[in-house]
Swiss-Prot record:
It comes from Picrophilus torridus (strain ATCC 700027 / DSM 9790 / JCM 10055 / NBRC 100828 / KAW 2/3). It is found in: Cytoplasm. Belongs to the class-I aminoacyl-tRNA synthetase family. MetG type 1 subfamily. Pfam families: tRNA-synt_1g, tRNA_bind. Its main location: cytoplasm. This is Methionine--tRNA ligase. One of its GO terms (biological process) is methionyl-tRNA aminoacylation. Its cofactor is Zn(2+). The keyword Metal-binding applies.
Length: 690
């Protein structure tokens, strides 16, 4: 019996390009889940959109000297296209600046106000003396009072996931001026979460299908005691409060953006000219609603949004909130604001969407953080998708086509029952949103398929009926494998289905698995070996210990340093006016080791020292690694070439959040030491001098 399913996907901020962390956190899993359910005959509404009123949009607008609306317009269009580039297809990708959204927010606000779930209170808000303005929560950074993370935002700590108020931060600072904000009392509306605690706990007790990390994190916060939470702010960019006397205030983004899920469903209904269609998904208690989000969005979707829905009274509560953990880039967290890691479109310039979707699904951070590696992507795509699955399909189709064999329907070999079992296990995994496990089951089925074809060796069969049965069975197996792959890699799977003779437009599992009218076409191999020419950064960062420091005999402003790295080397450096020999002697320092040796005033120099300049200060970062150790640059390997100073100028090093970052090819990459970001005690924005 078919089901009606609502799938809502976190609304990304319209302030910059989408990166792979976004895709792994929410969007790819949601798209796979939606495609799977539609193949099963379920009716699905798939909703997302741009979150356009958040503080990140105003920050981006200020940096680019433009309006928040212009920023939102640009990135809304870019996000729409990016999702299409990756075959992620929503029924509706809405906008929170849409007037329809403002109507929904107004209705929600008044509903909760009339039911006494909103109340006016005074609260202290951060005020920046330099700008003369009240500052949004995200403009305040400091130390998290719960976990001690020293770069928590005023609305949330990215490290432990706690929602915060700016006044809770230890040593708070305005991001614009780095000065301590004033906290001034102003009147605002508060959501009475404290009145909803018991109902929230009762609701949570019915959520047996949630991931343990999601349910435990949520329950622990509620058990600590929920407090009234402000839903308005002294800001200019946001949905106006629908009451007189509050013209200078706006409804805060964490409250209004959640209502965008309802707006998206309503706007979609208008688009298909069925104004009540959305009600089938929001008012019917039999509908299952899923919210695909990243780890940082858990409290908003498991506490605040259910509380808002309970208070409102008309709408379905979330059936499941399958939040994923973080995708990391060589140990560091992907970050849109900091430009760390690949954006989606940068990755798609290196690999096609089929390969990227496959690899991202295979490393999806469902129960713990996972790490993206370009080298691993190449390896897994080539060894699994191409060598195992693609090669099986090509061998079957090629054998039939080359021998011009006309396949007749017959009873397949009993091994087909194993593939039915694989399919059942695969289906159970995806129904329970174990996307990575579903792909692993598929890979086990691919292995069995190759074993069957090799062991039956059709090229050695002389009996025509037996040959037909083996090839018919192989084609049936091909349908099972391709049907199971389709939610993960839809474009390539569609082409392979066509080459098997399956021409149906609206795919359903029943049709694919029951198909037996095979008219196979050989065509080209379904996949080509993946090679990424530009997968190496040609720079060798190595650790060395300073053994001695001498004055240069022919230049008053230069030092001659003896350094032990992979071997004993000599370096000529111009840091003499900044640092004494005592500052350098015995220090473990970071070098660019593969620079072409140069003779400087009569002495050969074999490397370049990495130094940090901030104002008039020069800092030599010290590292805790053995001499000769190489630092890792996110996902890239040193290719062993010697480079000139002109080539080195293609690379730019900066300090960001006390981490050494390499800028290259319009991307930013974290330098890591033993799998962790290399920490440098220098202010953000410090430049690297060589």
């Amino acid at each position: 019996m078919s089901e009606r399913i609502l799938v809502n996907c976190a609304l990304p901020y319209a302030n910059g390009p989408l990166h792979l962390g976004h895709i792994a956190g929410a969007y790819l899993a949601a798209d796979i889940f939606v495609r799977f359910n539609r193949l099963n005959g379920n009716e699905v509404l798939f909703v997302s959109g741009s979150d356009e009123y958040g503080t990140p949009i105003t920050i981006t607008a200020e940096k680019n000297k433009t309006s928040p609306q212009n920023v939102a317009d640009i990135y809304h269009r870019e996000h729409e296209q990016t999702f299409k580039n990756l075959d992620i297809v929503f029924d509706i990708f809405t906008r929170t600046t849409d007037p329809e959204h403002v109507k929904d927010v107004d209705e929600f606000f008044i509903n909760l106000l009339n039911k006494n779930y909103l109340e006016k209170r005074y609260m202290v808000s951060p005020y920046c003396k330099s700008t003369g303005k009240f500052m949004p929560d995200r403009y305040i950074h400091g130390t998290c009072p719960y976990c001690g993370f020293n770069d928590a935002r005023g609305d949330q700590c990215d490290e432990c996931g706690r929602t915060l108020d700016p006044i809770e931060l230890i040593n708070p600072r305005c991001t614009s001026s780095n000065e301590e904000p004033l906290f001034i009392a102003t009147e605002h509306f508060f959501l009475r979460l404290d009145l909803l605690s018991d109902e929230l706990l009762n609701y949570l007790n019915t959520r047996e299908n949630w991931k343990p990390n999601v349910i435990n994190f949520t329950r622990s916060i509620i058990n600590e005691g929920l407090r009234p939470r402000p839903i308005t702010r002294d800001i200019d960019w946001g949905v106006p409060i629908p009451l007189n006397g509050f013209e200078g205030k706006r409804i805060y983004v964490w409250f209004e953006a959640l209502i965008g899920y309802i707006t998206g469903a309503r706007v979609y209904s208008k688009n298909i000219k069925d104004d009540d269609y959305w009600k089938k998904f929001w008012l019917d208690k039999n509908v299952k609603s899923y919210y695909f989000i990243g780890k940082d969005n858990i409290p908003f979707h498991t506490i605040i949004w259910p509380a808002m829905l309970i208070a409102h009274g008309d709408y379905n509560l979330p059936y499941n909130v399958p939040a994923n953990e973080y995708l990391r880039f060589e140990g560091a967290q992907f970050s849109k604001s900091r430009g760390i890691g690949y954006t989606v479109n940068e990755a798609l310039s290196l690999v096609n969407k089929n390969y990227l979707r496959y690899y991202m699904a295979s490393i999806m951070p469902e129960t713990g953080d996972s790490s993206f590696s370009l080298n691993e992507l190449v390896s897994r795509v080539n060894s699994e998708l191409i060598d195992k699955y693609g090669n099986f399909i090509y061998r079957v189709l090629g054998f039939i086509s080359n021998r011009k064999i006309n396949i007749k329907k017959c009873e397949p070999d009993s091994i087909i029952n194993e593939f039915k079992r694989f399919f059942d296990e695969y289906s159970e995994s995806i129904k329970n949103i174990k996307i990575k496990n579903g792909l692993q089951i598929w890979l086990e089925a691919v292995t069995l398929a190759n074993n069957y074809f090799n062991s039956e060796a059709p090229w050695n069969i002389n009996d025509h009926e037996r040959l037909n049965q083996v090839l018919f069975t192989s084609l049936k197996i091909s349908m099972y494998l391709t049907a199971m792959l389709y939610p993960y890699v839809p474009s390539a799977s569609s082409e392979i289905l066509s080459s098997l003779g399956f021409k149906t437009v609206n795919y359903k599992f029943d049709d694919m698995l029951g198909f037996d009218d095979f008219r196979p076409l050989k065509g080209e191999p379904p996949f080509k070996k993946l090679e990424i020419a530009d997968k190496k950064i040609n720079i060798d960062l190595m650790v060395g210990t300073v053994k001695y420091v001498n004055d240069h005999p022919n230049a008053d402003n230069l030092y001659v340093l003896g350094v032990h790295a992979d071997r004993d080397i000599t370096i000529v450096s111009n840091i003499k006016k900044y640092l004494t020999p005592e500052n350098l002697q015995g220090r473990r320092i970071l070098l660019i080791r593969n620079v072409k040796p140069a003779t400087i005033r009569g002495i050969k120099s074999e490397a370049i020292i990495i130094a940090v300049q901030h104002g008039e200060r020069i800092i030599i970062p010290e590292v805790n690694a053995d001499d000769g150790s190489r630092m890792k640059i996110d996902g890239f390997d040193f290719n062993g070439d010697i480079i000139s100073m002109d080539e080195i100028k293609r690379y730019k090093f900066i300090v960001d959040k006390n981490e050494l970052v390499l800028e290259y090819n319009n991307s930013r990459f974290i330098i890591t030491e033993n799998g962790k970001p290399l920490k440098i005690n220098a202010p953000d924005g410090s430049s690297i001098v060589l």
